[in-house]
A protein has these predicted regions:
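Short, solvent-exposed loop/edge segments of extracellular or virion-exposed proteins
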Residues: 1-8, 96-111, 198-214
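Structural beta-strand segments of beta-rich domains
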Residues: 13-17, 116-120, 219-223
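Short proline/glycine-enriched turn/loop motifs at strand-loop junctions of beta-rich domains
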Residues: 21-27, 124-130, 227-233
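Short strand-edge motifs at loop-to-beta-strand transitions and within beta-strands
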Residues: 45-51, 147-153, 253-257
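Surface-exposed, short loops/turns at beta-strand junctions within beta-sandwich domains
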Residues: 53-61, 155-163
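Extracellular recognition modules
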Residues: 63-69, 165-171
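Short, solvent-exposed loop/turn segments at the edges of extracellular beta-sandwich modules
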Residues: 69-78, 171-180
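Flexible, low-complexity linkers/stalks enriched in Thr/Pro that connect modular domains
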Residues: 82-99, 103, 182-200, 205
Length: 257
């Protein structure tokens, strides 16, 4: 066939049957996949039958038959098998991706920060000749185990904040494509945040009645700070010791220890 892989064909591909006779032929009737087909006379008793495959053709090994006579009208035996064992298989079924999910190695599996590994999992319905994966606009070569694939990518400080986008395009042996697959099957997603939080206000005081800048035994030290965004992990020390308590002011990014 004229497919990239000449032993396979898909809808829209042309299949050829080439044959050579010991003399000039007449009354040629070439059928390919059960349908009468066109043929070319290349001269010197060389011929080529050809046919454009479509969605109505049966899948599997493509059959053919060559009926003919010589110029005098004598009929020779039909030709329906190759002499060099070549064959063309026809596939009109589009491959399907399933079990598509995405996660990260962050403690929160639906979030990722700089240096975290984002993993994309998927399963193919049939063998492939090519698969292309993009994660956050970067080409990734997936690892394959049977029909299962995993593609991983380390997130960088140059990656844009927000939902991590991906794309999978898989072609089966005949070149049928899944198209551009960009959504998970289970609704999973990973949100990337590569912007470090900033403390834009830090205030340190005491409950001393005379001077909040002085503390004596029995006074409480207060450390107030405001973050540019909500924080998921805090480590605070006062005078080298862990504070009695740290809490967030409700509905704000203001914290107190």
């Amino acid at each position: 066939s004229n497919n990239m892989n000449t032993t396979w064909a898909k809808p829209g591909d042309t299949v050829f049957v080439k044959f050579v006779a010991n003399e000039e032929l007449d009354n040629l009737d070439v059928t390919i996949s059960g349908v009468s087909s066109e043929y070319l006379d290349d001269g010197a008793a060389n011929y080529r039958g050809y046919r454009l495959m479509n969605n109505n053709d049966n899948e599997g090994t493509i059959t053919f038959n060559i009926a003919y006579t010589d110029l005098g009208g004598a009929t020779g035996p039909d030709g329906n098998a190759t002499t060099d064992e070549t064959r063309v298989r026809y596939d009109r079924t589009l491959p399907i991706l399933s079990n598509i999910r995405i996660s990260s190695n962050n403690a929160m599996g639906d979030s990722a920060g700089i240096g975290d590994i984002d993993s994309l999992f998927f399963t193919a319905s049939e063998p492939q000749r090519n698969v292309e994966v993009l994660i956050s606009d970067s080409n990734v070569v997936p690892i394959q185990n049977g029909s299962d694939f995993i593609a991983t990518r380390e997130m960088l400080d140059s990656d844009p904040d927000g939902l991590i986008l991906f794309s999978i395009i898989l072609e089966d042996s005949a070149g049928n494509s899944t198209g551009d697959v960009t959504e998970t099957n289970d609704g999973s997603f990973v949100w990337f945040d590569g912007t470090p939080p900033l403390l834009d206000m830090v205030s340190f005081s005491s409950t001393n009645d005379n001077d909040s800048g002085v503390a004596i035994i029995g006074d409480t030290l207060l450390l107030d700070f405001n973050s540019s965004e909500l924080l998921s992990s805090l480590s605070v020390s006062i005078a080298g010791l862990e504070p009695d308590t740290t809490f967030e002011v409700p509905s704000r990014t203001l914290y107190r220890s």
